[in-house]
Each structure stands twice: as structure tokens, then as C-alpha cells.
A protein has these predicted regions:
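Conserved ABC transporter NBD signature motif
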Residues: 57-65, 77, 117
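Short coil-to-helix segment of the ABC ATPase nucleotide-binding domain corresponding to the Q-loop/switch region
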Residues: 93-101
Length: 133
């Protein structure tokens, strides 16, 4: 679960990227960030990934207070968040199943976990027929 409570991000010079954002994203929930250029979409993600630090407010990811997270734990935090960008990149030498499984492989997941989670995602987006294309 991701929780943001009264989160603001103001850059040096006073430019406001995010102002008093409060929201909850449940585990397994899909969220689409849509908005004009400069509306704070990327800044929101960078706050979650701890690339940016909130000017005020509280951010929790998987019950972890991001503001108190030591630097060495940031990669562990980032593994708990999945992001698909507007221009997804696919590896040409891999089929659909292998492209979906790639992130799990990199994270060191066990083969049976990779198989199960990848099949679940294929079901979710109705791509079972294209898994090995």
C-alpha cells in the first residue's frame, strides 16, 4: 500500500510541483497518472522512489516511512513499486512472457514465482494467447 498525507514538493526557486496531495493506493491497485506536461506526474513518482524529497507531508510505501529510510535501503523500496511508462521498452530477443518476467528475474525471484506472477499478469491484461510470440 502507498499512502501520501498532505505531501508537497517545492523546488528551489519556489516552483510548486505538488501541493498538499493526500491519497492511498491499495496493494495490487492500478493507478494511471494523466496530466499536462509539468503537472507533477514524474515528480510524484520520484517522491515514491526517493529521488526527490517531499518539502512537507508523509509518504509510506509498504508500511515503510520513506522519509526515515536510510540510503542503503532505497533499492529495497524501489523493488516494491512497479511502474509502466507511457513508452514501454521491450527486449527484441524475448517473447511477451519473457519480457514480463524480466523484472522478476532481475530481482532474483525463484523460477516458480516468476512463472506464477507472469501468468497472473498475462491473465490480467488478457495476453495469454500472445505469451510466446
Amino acid at each position: 500500500m502507498i499512502k501520501l498525507k498532505n505531501v508537497s514538493l517545492v523546488f528551489q526557486g519556489g516552483s510548486v510541483a505538488i501541493s498538499n496531495l493526500t491519497t492511498i493506493v491499495q496493494e495490487g491497485e492500478f493507478v494511471y497518472l494523466v496530466g499536462h506536461s509539468g503537472s507533477g506526474k514524474s515528480s510524484f513518482l520520484k517522491l515514491l522512489y526517493k529521488e526527490y524529497f517531499a518539502t512537507k507531508g508523509e509518504i509510506e510505501v509498504a508500511n515503510i516511512d520513506v522519509s526515515k529510510l536510510p540510503k542503503w535501503k532505497i533499492p529495497l523500496l524501489r523493488r516494491k513499486i512497479g511502474i509502466v511508462t507511457q513508452e514501454p521498452q521491450l527486449l527484441e530477443n524475448r517473447n511477451t512472457f519473457e519480457n514480463i518476467a524480466f523484472a522478476l528475474e532481475v530481482m532474483g525471484a525463484l523460477p516458480e514465482e516468476i512463472e506464477a506472477k507472469t501468468n497472473t499478469l498475462l491473465d490480467l491484461v488478457e495476453l495469454n494467447d500472445s505469451a510466446y510470440k
